[in-house]
Amino acid sequence: SSDIAEDKCTLSLDSSGESLHRRGYRQEAVEAPLNEVLAAGMILMTGWKGECDLIDPMCGSGTIPIEAALIARNIAPGVFRKEFAFEKWNDFDQELFDRIYNDDSQEREFTHKIFGYDNNPKANEIATHNVKAAGLSKEIILKIQPFQQFEQPKEKSIIITNPPYGERISTNDL
């Protein structure tokens, strides 16, 4: 697109295509899913980088556990995208892109676990599908469990969640 204002012209090229907040691993979602970038931001604001277990007691479609695993393993967030708009540019260098895109030299081992709980069997099914699509089944353990049955872990861990709110939830749903 271009914009002309008085004697200035701004030319913008779409290099990403689909919005970058759509990471590419989400196969399905629950009602009102958490934005992937917001989930990553919530995790990063805690300073957590994988040095202990992480628990999401109301994980819905698994966005927080998946983003946490990506952060813990230092996996680039765009790695699941099928395509970028810049791949259609005339001067696109496929060999260079493949070399950068497939470089996993900065990835880390993750020796802890990420736990995602939800009381909704359908949400658990969706989260399981998304975790598998992201290739993170080794790092993330999902379980159908009501919030009231949550027990404080014995080991140091961090809890991050996005509880349902508003009309989507009633006391009976917890």
Where do the model's predicted regions map?
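Non-catalytic substrate-recognition/targeting regions of SAM-dependent transferases
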Residues: 1-25
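A short, flexible beta-alpha/helix-coil linker loop
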Residues: 19, 165-168
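Class I SAM-dependent methyltransferase Rossmann-like catalytic core
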Residues: 24-34
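Conserved S-adenosyl-L-methionine
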Residues: 34-151
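Hydrophobic alpha-helix-in-membranes signature
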Residues: 56, 162-163
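Glycine-rich S-adenosyl-L-methionine
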Residues: 170-174
